[in-house]
Swiss-Prot record:
Membrane topology category: Peripheral membrane protein
Protein name: Ceramide-binding protein SVF1
Record function comment: Ceramide-binding protein that may transfer ceramides from the endoplasmic reticulum membrane to the cis-Golgi network membrane, and is thereby required for the biosynthesis of complex sphingolipids.
Keywords, in A-Z order: Cytoplasm, Endoplasmic reticulum, Golgi apparatus, Lipid transport, Membrane, Nucleus, Transport
UniProt GO molecular function: ceramide binding
Gene transcribed to yield this protein: SVF1
GO CC aspect terms: cis-Golgi network membrane; cytoplasm; endoplasmic reticulum membrane; nucleus
One Pfam family this sequence matches: Svf1_C
């Protein structure tokens, strides 16, 4: 059980946490250092955690149509804050490079929701994992502004970092006061339709990433910044999920990279470098980059633990000119009230998500691959050394 009170008075008041130090964060990536990071997901890994303590749990399905530059995501948010009743939300984002009038953002409260293993149901919405645990079908008509009927079929194995893909906060991993957990389907085909602005858009053998996440603590206490990449080409997919903790947890970086070819996971990397190229402070006060350069270093996914030390390194790089900003999301203006209440009024906390959709270049094994990337740069709280 999560015990926020163990995190000190800050968990109750929202004030800055004391400096606990690096020994108070136990990351999933550090547990696999010197071992094979890649572990394949099981059906149980895909089940909603549905824990009783305070948390925010999400299932996010990103989609990319390389030829048209259409990209976006559908997301279910399932949350419990303190002693309040559980709440659920469906959010949907669509960006279309050649037809900007189709751009859509919806956020809709869900009613009469429930979870059943990996499945989620609400009035006018269903998310179901098939019996073979190789495809999800998402159907939603909770709002006429984004009607969704799409199926995501796994093209590669699912990915988790280690047997337990959870990062724990606190001095006792058996009774942590905070957690962060991610599991991934890094390369999927997506088929179906979405209706926006009264127009039906067809997805046919396009590409997708699926991410299940659980955050079991206040977002501004868990991380001060995030970097995210969802890159697809016809032959490869690259995913990055990276966050940096606040000073209270020693500015610790937890970075997960996944490199795939058409049908396999080539490497899961935990030693990644993200360069924010030519950052410039914008009107809200954050140093926004003009480009991103992401370097991934790891070992082949087939290497067993006993051979990791002697294994030949594998590396890749993704470069993106951030020419197209889809949205600068003022999180405090967009998030549901139940989440806003836990971050409002915190000094130095001004969360913004910068969402981009751009062409990108993957460099791997001496070759270059052009593709399309949905990337996000998130700033949550002031940077301190």
């Amino acid at each position: 059980m999560l015990k926020w009170i163990q995190g000190g008075i800050s968990s109750v008041t929202g004030i800055a946490e004391p400096e606990y130090g690096p020994e108070f964060i136990h990351s999933a990536t550090e547990r696999v250092r010197g071992k094979q990071p890649f572990h394949e997901t099981s059906r149980q890994d895909l089940a909603w955690r549905n824990i009783s303590s305070t948390h925010v749990e999400t299932a996010t399905f990103y989609f990319t149509q390389i030829q048209t530059g259409m990209a976006g995501f559908a997301q279910i948010i399932y949350s419990k804050i303190g002693g309040l009743p559980r709440t659920a939300q469906f959010t949907f984002r669509l960006h279309h490079a050649s037809r900007p009038e189709l751009g859509t953002w919806t956020s809709t409260k869900l009613e009469n929701f429930r979870v059943e293993g990996a499945n989620f149901y609400a009035d006018n919405l269903s998310l179901e994992l098939d019996s073979t645990a190789t495809s999800y079908t998402l159907q939603s008509s909770v709002t006429a502004d984004s009607v969704v009927d799409i199926t995501f079929k796994r093209l590669t194995p699912g990915v988790k970092v280690g047997e337990d893909p959870t990062t724990y906060y606190g001095d006792n991993t058996k009774e942590p006061w905070g957690t962060m957990r991610h599991v991934f389907w890094p390369r999927n085909s997506v088929n179906g339709t979405v209706v926006v602005h009264g127009e039906m858009i067809t997805l046919k053998n396009d590409y997708s990433v699926m991410i299940l996440a659980l955050q079991g603590m206040k977002p501004h206490h868990a991380a001060k910044a995030w970097n995210f990449l969802n890159f697809h080409s016809e032959t490869h997919s690259v995913l990055l999920m990276e966050f940096t903790t606040p000073k209270s947890y020693a500015n610790t970086k937890v970075s997960i990279g996944i490199l795939c070819d058409k049908d396999s996971v080539l490497s899961v990397t935990i030693d990644n470098e993200v360069e924010h190229v030519k950052p410039k402070t914008d009107e809200v006060g954050w140093p926004v980059p003009k480009a991103l350069s992401m370097k991934f270093t790891g070992i082949p996914s087939s290497v067993p633990d006993k051979e990791v030390a002697s294994a030949e390194k594998l590396s890749a790089r993704v470069d993106i000119e951030l020419k197209n900003l889809v949205e600068r999301v003022d999180v405090m203006a967009e998030i549901p009230a139940f989440v806003k209440n836990i971050v409002s009024g915190v000094v130095g906390t001004k969360p913004y998500i910068y969402q981009y959709a751009n062409e990108a270049l993957l460099t791997y094994a001496g070759s270059e691959y052009k593709g399309f990337a949905w990337s996000e740069v998130t700033f949550i709280s002031e940077f301190e050394n």
